[in-house]
Amino acid sequence: MAVLISPMIVPLIISGVAIFFFMAKAGLAATHTGIVLAHIILGTPFVVITVTATLSGFDHSVTRAAASLGSNPVNTFMKITLPLILPGVISGGLFAFVTSFDEVVVVLFLAGLENTTIPIQMWTGLREQLSLSLIHI
């Protein structure tokens, strides 16, 4: 569990440098795949924490009752378990999305000249010309 939430604990610049060196060794620096993997690494702690908290409060007697009434495991998961844990999964996904959208440091390390994401474009706009349109985003 500590390994999964370590990107949340370690300072962002250290995570960015570590992810860059790892992606460079793997040949994924300055690629879309490398950027996506970096966002997955940085968003995973938020999903793990919210889904773990949701599952800790989950009542397993409901799934046992469904199994005792003859429901197969796939049907039990789709009709009972998933609707009950869906708020935690959605909130974890939203946290991961907001973190990914806000992430500039790691993407500045990983993105080459041809890769432009929205945070990099916003950073470039702030650096080159101060525009009030960036405040609205």
Please identify what each model-predicted range represents:
Residues S15-A26, T50, L94-S100, A111, ...:
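A structural signal for multi-pass alpha-helical bundles of membrane permease subunits
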Residues S6, S61-L69, M122, L134:
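Short hydrophobic faces within alpha-helices
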Residues F101-H136:
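Interhelical loop and adjacent transmembrane-helix boundary motif
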Residues I9-L42, V74, L110-E114:
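Membrane-interfacial helix termini and adjacent extracytoplasmic/periplasmic loops
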Residues M1-L4, V17, F21-K25, H60-T63, ...:
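Transmembrane-helix boundary motif in ABC transporter permease subunits
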Residues A2, H32-V36, F77, V89:
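The feature captures the transmembrane alpha-helix scaffold of multi-pass secondary transporters
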Residues A2, S15-I19, V47, G93-L94, ...:
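Hydrophobic/aromatic residues in alpha-helical transmembrane segments
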Residues I40-I41, V47-H60, N72-D102:
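Transmembrane alpha-helices
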